[in-house]
């Protein structure tokens, strides 16, 4: 009996330490770099009552990102705060048809490059956690701030001269992602679903006209980084 009591007393601190370890909250920081491509749910332009998107060809160009982050983890669940600095690049080629031939030529193109700051807050869950190998899924809201004073736009061969798109300075998204971590190195694959429109309107300065632009962008991104 005495031996049993001694064994229980010896094992009690070990079990208590394990319990404290399971309930411990970990705070980590890291840095990641990556690239992103933009697609659109509805790349529709409207000019003088004409709308055209069915003949639109999207040329998805690559933008680049740099992001410091902080992660707070409890057991298998974590919350991650990021600040993503990056560029977005994309273009549209519009095909002229009978209904819009008075607006477009055969080689009409619109290209755009922007500088932006993205602030996501995601909640993740480590589905697989074996030693140094971890696979997780995550989701959460993202706000994108566009530095409109530094954007680069080009409208080619539109029949209205000196056109410019007035972009929204703040847009909202919802993130869905998959992460793989090996030791301190990780890879993230993310899809951002656009919730709000990215454009206010398009103006023709020479003709003093304002055109509607109705589109929400989605963002596909890949990043690699280290967490400490």
Predicted regions: what is each one?
Residues 1-28, 32, 220-228:
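Bacterial Sec-dependent N-terminal signal peptides
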Residues 19-67, 227:
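Short glycine/proline- and aromatic-enriched beta-strand/turn motifs that initiate or cap beta-hairpins
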Residues 19-27, 75-76, 128-134:
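Short loop/turn motifs that connect adjacent beta-strands in outer-membrane beta-barrel proteins
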Residues 27-33, 64, 79-83, 117-119, ...:
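Transmembrane beta-strands of outer-membrane beta-barrel proteins
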Residues 35-39, 74-76, 85-89, 127, ...:
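Transmembrane beta-strands of outer-membrane beta-barrel pores
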Residues 38-61, 88-116, 142-175, 195-221:
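Extracellular/periplasm-exposed beta-strand and loop segments of Gram-negative cell-envelope proteins
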Residues 69-73, 122-126, 177-181, 188, ...:
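Transmembrane beta-barrel domains of outer membrane proteins
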Residues 183-186, 214-228:
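Outer-membrane beta-barrel "beta-signal"
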